[in-house]
Amino acid sequence: MSLKARIQEDVKTAMRAHERERLAALRLVTAAIKQKEVDERIDLNDEQVLAVLDKMVKQRRESLEQYEQAGRDDLEAREQFELDLIHSYLPEPLGAAALADLIRSTITELGASSLRDMGPVMNALRPQVQGRADMKAVSEAVKAQLAS
């Protein structure tokens, strides 16, 4: 079952169980997926759905920080619930050691030696770490390894 189909099934399940908060969060996810499909005029595959979910996670984290600073516990709780729900659809995150090994092997495989080679390294890594690691952290780790 594709990721998009699984989300649709979970929407139906939440409707039947009268889980309002979960249903609202799932509808936000489906709306983001549909928006991307309409914008691009394509049916999204699992990899593209993961990219949409990654973007939503990043947005939720930023919102959480802002709500914490503003002391808005009510909004913070809702945002955290949405973040947890989105995380349930993402694959298991990569550990720091596994990520470092993957970066090292990709750099070796491509023969990258300087910061100029960062683009091809990131392009090779992106499909492997999409949804499993924060791309900003991956970028910083690649930059650090290429600089040394």
Give names to the regions the model predicted.
Residues 1-148:
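Charged, compositionally biased, marginally structured helical/coil segments
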